[in-house]
Amino acid sequence: MAVARVDAALPPGEGSVVNWSGQGLQKLGPNLPCEADIHTLILDKNQIIKLENLEKCKRLIQLSVANNRLVRMMGVAKLTLLRVLNLPHNSIGCVEGLKELVHLEWLNLAGNNLKAMEQINSCTALQHLDLSDNNISQIGDLSKLVSLKTLLLHGNIITSLRMAPAYLPRSLAILSLAENEIRDLNEISFLASLTELEQLSIMNNPCVMATPSIPGFDYRPYIVSWCLNLRVLDGYVISQKESLKAEWLYSQGKGRAYRPGQHIQLVQYLATVCPLTSTLGLQTAEDAKLEKILSKQRFHQRQLMNQSQNEELSPLVPVETRASLIPEHSSPVQDCQISQESEPVIQVNSWVGINSNDDQLFAVKNNFPASVHTTRYSRNDLHLEDIQTDEDKLNCSLLSSESTFMPVASGLSPLSPTVELRLQGINLGLEDDGVADESVKGLESQVLDKEEEQPLWAANENSVQMMRSEINTEVNEKAGLLPCPEPTIISAILKDDNHSLTFFPESTEQKQSDIKKPENTQPENKETISQATSEKLPMILTQRSVALGQDKVALQKLNDAATKLQACWRGFYARNYNPQAKDVRYEIRLRRMQEHIVCLTDEIRRLRKERDEERIKKFVQEEAFRFLWNQVRSLQVWQQTVDQRLSSWHTDVPPISSTLVPSKHPLFTQSQESSCDQNADWFIASDVAPQEKSLPEFPDSGFHSSLTEQVHSLQHSLDFEKSSTEGSESSIMGNSIDTVRYGKESDLGDVSEEHGEWNKESSNNEQDNSLLEQYLTSVQQLEDADERTNFDTETRDSKLHIACFPVQLDTLSDGASVDESHGISPPLQGEISQTQENSKLNAEVQGQQPECDSTFQLLHVGVTV
């Protein structure tokens, strides 16, 4: 158990303070060392779960058990003398044990788990009640707490204020409803019964929070229109413009025409009459009108103040009293304070009343002595004061507390009238020109009075008119225009002397000596009086004229200086703080920027268009070059193909004729020449014939061949061979038939296939020829072996071979014609050479056939594989 620590000792009879905060206490045991005279017990920041064994502290007045783990508060039931109970930030679920605490004045249950406001009505002496940051959903019955001044309910889940007129006491001055769930702004109408409410907080509720669907509006004038005596709303002092707007909403507008449930309609109306300004100090047309009204109100207040001063100083006093008061230089502020203490003060309304002066700027108040702080001038139960501006409201500093908002200190004195005139002269100059001239004149007159050490009443218009009338009477009397009794002249002279003291302090001693003589000694006769009067009248007139001239010159200089200062200040203020001037400058900048952006955009578009055109031109040129290059390549290929065909045609014709037909057969040679001529004619005709569908429009590249061309070429070659065989049939039949060997009709297909392969592999002729020679030699050897065994059978079938000879000859002629049409001669030449070699081998093997003809040896090469 921690030991109690005595922090401070009170005087005898008042007890002491025990602070056990932060000691890690979990419970209060029965051996609690509590003295009988302890009046304050602090148990903050421990781990106490239950309040027990506090009966020993019977005289306990203040108990604080903040930031613990309390679940119940029944342990305070026997502390009947308790006045302050601080139990915030615990886990208390319900209010209990307060029925006997009739002396309780201050109760803090913030930050707990309360769901209802129960059993608090018994604490009739309660003045401060903090139930913030709980789970309270509706206002409970507090009507019996007639002394309650402060009720803090922020941070709960209250949705309606419908029960406020019945449950809340009329004496309530501070009410905090911030951070709740009030969704209808019309609920504020239920607070109209709280006539003494001065401070209200309703911020961070859904009804006043900005949403994208609802236009911005200023809810402050609407709340003030229901709570007429409200001075502070959401931590800011109610300004005079807001008060005027609230009065307009109450009297002429539709502020009270809406009922609970019409939140959207109310918000739309407030958005039109009380729009929300986004910039600080931004004034709309309505704000300008309100400022003019307030400036005129201030001007009339000053007029009433001057009239009250003049009427207080207007009664004539004896010469001795006036002479004795002038050298003392009594300030008008002291006179006003005396009049304020002697006469009663009555509040006129909410915005020109006694309460609004308490909300002045504290920093300005603290810069001046307390003896000068006053702005109240009363006459005939009329209270006058200066109006607070919006700048004062925005710059005011409020005292913060644990409950978000606390009352503003109202005991401070307001500003003095002279200081108020100096401070507000500049502001009035910015609002209204007419009022500005009056304020500048008042400021200049104050400076002049300070330099010449004359009191404030000497500068009033009434006193100046009085002095002018006195001077006129003196001049008229001297000129004999108006008969005037001698006492009047004496009084006028004395008054002028008294006034001249204020304008010429360097001649004070002389004037005082002149004044003391008539005071101490009574004039003996009329002659001495008239003599003194005749001596002083010229001097008084000259001094008065000089004084008036000096006043005019000095006043003109001050006016010029003030005009220059005011012009400079107005220019600076307009450029930096006037919303219209700032908007105009901003608009000019935006226009220039927009013009520059448009110019740059046009330039970029022009450059982009030129770039696109250049790109299109370049693309067209590339396509044209590509097309021309393809044309050139196709022409080159076509030219090569034509040259190759022509060369092959010229080179292939003689070997074929010399190989196939011997020179001793003139008939075959002539027929071959005629067939060659026909073939050449067919070659030329085939290039031009339109009916050949396989030919492309472009010249043949030489890399492809169509089947139709082969078919036509075969047909022409067959016709040629038919004509050739008819002429040489007799010579062929005369040769030996035994040397000619053809197997079957299938050999013809093999020969045609070999010719097709040779046509495809024309580029590798030499390699193919060598391989073909090896292959044919091997095949020929095998066939020779077979021929030796089947020689007898071959002789029997010689007739069959003779019958098949024309067909074989036609086939060979077809192959030769195909080679001629396509211009491929090397394979045919290789075939002829190979057949010659094979015929030599056959001659060696078959020695009994010497009469074999070379032509038939060529035909003998067609071997079946």
Swiss-Prot record:
Q: Write out the GO cellular component annotations.
A: centriole; centrosome; cytosol; protein-containing complex
Where is the PTM Phosphothreonine found along the chain?
Answer: T542
Record bears the keyword Phosphoprotein: yes
Polar residues bias: start-end ranges: 725-738
* Keyword terms, alphabetized: Calmodulin-binding, Cilium biogenesis/degradation, Cytoplasm, Cytoskeleton, Leucine-rich repeat, Phosphoprotein, Repeat
CCP110-binding, as annotated region: 300-750
Read off the CDD domains from this record.
IQCD (cd23767)
Record has Membrane as a keyword: no
Broad class of where this protein is predominantly found: cytoplasm
What is one Gene Ontology biological process annotated in the Swiss-Prot or TrEMBL record? regulation of mitotic spindle assembly
Q: Start-end of the LRR repeats? A: 37-58, 59-80, 81-102, 103-124, 125-146, 147-168, 171-192, 196-205
Query: Which Pfam families does the annotation name?
Result: LRR_9
Q: Which domain of life does this protein belong to?
A: Eukaryota
Q: Which residues carry this modification: Phosphoserine?
A: S308, S413, S500, S530, S763
**Where is the region Disordered?**
506-529, 715-769
Looking at the record, the residues that make up the LRRCT domain are 211-249
Compartments in which it is found: Cytoplasm, Cytoskeleton, Microtubule organizing center, Centrosome; Cytoplasm, Cytoskeleton, Microtubule organizing center, Centrosome, Centriole
Compositional bias ranges of the Basic and acidic residues kind: 508-527, 741-760
Q: Where is the IQ domain?
A: 558-587
Q: Which GO terms describe its molecular function?
A: calmodulin binding
Q: Where is this region: Interaction with MPHOSPH9?
A: 587-865
Q: What does this protein do?
A: Acts as a key negative regulator of ciliogenesis in collaboration with CCP110 by capping the mother centriole thereby preventing cilia formation. Required for recruitment of CCP110 to the centrosome.
Oligomer and partners: Interacts with CALM1, CEP76, KIF24 and TALPID3. Interacts with CCP110. ENKD1 competes with CEP97 for binding to CCP110, destabilizing the interaction between CP110 and CEP97 which promotes the removal of CCP110 and CEP97 from the mother centriole and allows the initiation of ciliogenesis. Via its interaction with CCP110, may indirectly interact with HERC2 and NEURL4. Interacts with MPHOSPH9.
The identity of this protein, by name, is Centrosomal protein of 97 kDa
> In which organism is this protein found?
Homo sapiens (Human)
